[in-house]
Amino acid sequence: MTTATKPHQGRFRYLTRGSQPTPSKEAYLLPSLSEFGDIVTLPLTDLRPSLDLGQDSPYKLDVHGFTARRHDSALHSAPYSRASWNNEKLLRQIYFPEVEEFVKNVTGCKKAVVSAAVVRNRLYSEGDDSAPAEEEADTQASSSDDTSHMFPPIFGNSVKDGVCPAPKVHLDCTPKGARHHIRRYHSEVALAAEKVIEAENRLLESGVEWNDLKDHSGKVPHFALFSIWRPLKTVHRDPLALSSAASFPVSDYVPCDQREPTDHSIPSHLYRIVGRDDENIDKNDDTYQTQSYLAYAPRDAEKTSHAWHYISEQQPSDVLVIQLFDNEMEGHARAPLEGGKGKSDLGVGGAVHSAFELVDQDEDAEARESIEVRVAAFW
């Protein structure tokens, strides 16, 4: 007699349905955890069987908004150790180039630009209302060398300035947020995106609305934003889960304004937002307004419409590829109506995700340790 496998389940924190979140005034931060008051236990699918399938994986970036791969780093082998992942010089010289090549191999893009990294090594504190969400950082890491001015920024790479996961179901950028990001975040990203921005601006100046750019994707070069996420030791608590964009209903997306750092050295023809009066921009303001998605909990009877996935006991070589936005996917993918009764007009280009609490996880286990690298990709 075979023993049935115990189903995977996790507890997720959503906005209370009908509530409108209060945006954080701080760069990167999502609203306070107190606003995520709807705690729901939901089923999960394990991605582990797909790790070695490569391009044959059933999880497709242009369908689900995520995939998973097995990938080793040079930092996993001697003479390097766990401490090497807190060494900014090694991350910049070894790991970031590895990630850029990895993204090229997985997606086929021609250029990949690492834009930020976050190392997490702290337990989440229930009382920390300003704790950052899964793809956020609450502080610039300190080190013996002043690297705060360097690009890409690295957050949380010291014990003193550690960053923790926080269970807030979200997607880091709406389509408009992604387009503002490539224009306003940093000159290296904006310059890499120059052809994209110029093509979109021509459409916008011809009268196309921002929300209708999805209907003109064939006239704009392909670009995407990714988060490449791996643990630094086996994950026993507070894993990261991904929700399938193919089934996440339009009624559960909640747009929310957010702040990001800005770079005033970006050339003006790339920095400007067509259709907005930017003449009175405060050049002393170090942030700009962008937009993310938060979410309401699923309402279907089986609670499966969000189709959550994770990697059980995720190892350092088990890598999650999280698509935050892809303009080519947005050109054809539409969020389904609730109950699967057809498609809405909302273009989707990425996967909602969150740190979560595994049912029956060991609450005495050490803090999860992970590194996330943000990448802008261009074809």
Swiss-Prot record:
Keywords: Oxidoreductase
Protein name (record): Oxidoreductase chry3
EC number: 1.-.-.-
UniProt gene name: chry3
Lineage: Eukaryota, Fungi, Dikarya, Ascomycota, Pezizomycotina
Region (Disordered): 1-23, 126-150
UniProt feature, compositional bias: Acidic residues: 126-138
Protein family according to the UniProt entry: Belongs to the asaB hydroxylase/desaturase family.
Superkingdom of the source species: Eukaryota
Molecular-function annotations in GO: oxidoreductase activity
Pathway recorded for this protein: Pigment biosynthesis
Organism: Gibberella zeae (strain ATCC MYA-4620 / CBS 123657 / FGSC 9075 / NRRL 31084 / PH-1)
